[in-house]
Regions:
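Flexible, D/E/H-enriched segments
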Residues: 1-87, 118-220
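Short, hydrophobic/aromatic alpha-helical segments in well-folded domains
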Residues: 30, 88-92, 108
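Beta-strand elements within well-structured catalytic alpha/beta cores of enzymes
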Residues: 74, 101-109, 179
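Non-transmembrane, aqueous-exposed alpha-helical and coiled segments at domain scale
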Residues: 90-103
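A structural signal for small-residue-enriched, beta-sheet-centric alpha/beta enzyme cores
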Residues: 111-119
Length: 220
């Protein structure tokens, strides 16, 4: 995919961003094949050049992309529940294992993601936390998840999703759930290392977390 991207959500701050993203149709087709014969998951590997591209892809690509490295984006279906995200992530992991690829999974999405109303937004654009989180309880929920990340307690995060969803994580936290499932799901023991400070803006919470592969494997 090549072109320039202006975000319909953030045109003031993200406009005419150039991108030149090489795809990986072989891996996409391999992931699609994981759903063959199943009635609990449907996967489409789309190479339609008119399929819209979104800032969750372009923003990450701008900083981490390499024109010589294959890159593939995966949609997050907000009709899914936790089990759906877990299944899809597991199938992605299966496809990667069947391939000859060395793959980095980037879960591009935020934590609590409820916005203040329109009149309040201009007063809440700084990155000060927890003042600019919509509700202090949502901030506390984010901190609880980050604490579990730091301990490698992915089972605790996954099992706690019914409660955490009350804090309105972006995309029902599907970006994390798919990534975690590809790495072993509840059995994954990779600890999370903060690569940034936790930031809050207009009601929402964001942070960068890196999960290094344990020496003995993702579920060691």
């Amino acid at each position: 995919r090549q072109g320039k991207f202006t975000s319909s959500e953030l045109p003031r701050g993200m406009r005419q961003i150039p991108y030149d993203i090489p795809g990986d149709p072989e891996l996409a087709k391999l992931i699609e094949a994981q759903a063959e014969g199943r009635d609990d998951c449907r996967i489409l590997a789309s190479d339609d050049p008119y399929l819209p591209i979104y800032y969750g892809t372009v923003n990450i690509w701008t900083f981490l992309g390499d024109p010589n490295t294959a890159w593939m984006s995966v949609a997050l279906n907000q009709c899914c529940d936790t089990d759906d995200f877990q299944l899809f992530g597991k199938l992605i992991g299966n496809a990667i294992e069947q391939s000859d690829r060395r793959v980095v999974l980037l879960a591009s999405g935020g934590m609590t993601h409820r916005f203040f109303n329109f009149k309040e937004l201009p007063k809440r654009e700084s990155q000060k936390a927890p003042d600019n989180i919509f509700d202090r309880a949502y901030y506390d929920a984010d901190m609880g998840v980050l604490d579990k990340f730091g301990k490698g307690d992915h089972a605790g995060v996954i099992d706690g999703m019914p409660e955490y969803r009350k804090a309105y994580p972006e995309g029902h936290f599907g970006h994390y759930l798919m990534m975690a499932a590809a790495l072993g799901g509840r059995d994954c023991t990779a600890t999370g290392e903060l690569f940034s400070e936790y930031e809050a803006s207009v009601g929402t919470g964001q942070v960068h977390v890196w999960f290094e592969r344990p020496e003995g494997g993702w579920t060691a």
